[in-house]
């Protein structure tokens, strides 16, 4: 396993190597040593000329790959420039399924962070457990869901909550460059932590 994330929390907490899943050793399934999945799933699509194609369609709006890339790049700048994100830091994402949730996820990955998405129904107690176990210090949160997260913050090491949905996060994004150089993660670096309820 290569090491590129400066905050090694995720690698340090993996199960023993003998419990890792078995992977195929077919050459066509090999990944390069350095791979940021945001480049593969977003940047490469735009570079190949598909930037104006829709990536997310909601009842209110249709979002293109180019728009998602721009917003993700600006979010990555907010994380690095304003929040002091260190590659490997976990970032809690609290929102319903939405365009902005996807943009935040890609922004976290571009910056070398690890996205920890939550369900909107989680209360302060469940959020607090996640924040503690994953040692989360930064959160992006839909302003409509802020109350439970703010309650969870009181007894945690969560330092920063940036709200979106007509709030401060969009203001911070608006002054950031539209380009971002993705953090050069290794192909085996963790990019998400998914807590489950056991269902």
Q: Can you annotate each of these PLM segments?
A:
Residues 39-67:
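AMP-dependent adenylate-forming
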Residues 53, 87-89, 187:
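Phosphate-coordination loops involved in phosphoryl transfer and adenosine-cofactor binding
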Residues 64-67, 191-199:
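Conserved AMP-binding A3 loop
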Residues 1-36:
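Flexible, non-catalytic linker and terminal segments flanking ANL/adenylate-forming cores
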């Amino acid at each position: 396993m290569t090491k590129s994330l400066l905050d090694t929390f995720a690698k340090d907490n993996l199960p023993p190597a003998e419990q890792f899943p078995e992977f195929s050793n077919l050459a066509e399934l090999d990944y390069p040593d350095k791979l940021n999945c945001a480049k593969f799933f977003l940047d490469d699509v735009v570079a190949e000329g598909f930037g104006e194609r829709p990536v997310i369609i909601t009842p209110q709006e249709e979002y293109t790959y180019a728009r998602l890339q721009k917003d993700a790049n600006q979010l990555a700048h907010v994380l690095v420039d304003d929040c002091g994100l260190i590659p490997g830091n976990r970032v809690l994402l609290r929102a319903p399924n939405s365009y902005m949730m996807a943009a935040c996820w890609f922004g976290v990955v571009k910056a070398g962070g690890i996205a920890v998405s939550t369900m909107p129904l989680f209360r302060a107690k469940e959020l607090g457990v996640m924040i503690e176990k994953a040692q989360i210090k930064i959160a992006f949160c839909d302003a409509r869901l802020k109350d439970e997260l703010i309650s969870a913050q009181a007894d945690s090491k969560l330092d920063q909550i940036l709200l979106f949905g007509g709030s401060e996060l969009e203001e911070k994004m608006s002054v950031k460059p539209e380009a971002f150089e993705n953090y050069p993660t290794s192909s085996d670096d963790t990019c998400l932590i998914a807590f489950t309820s056991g269902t």
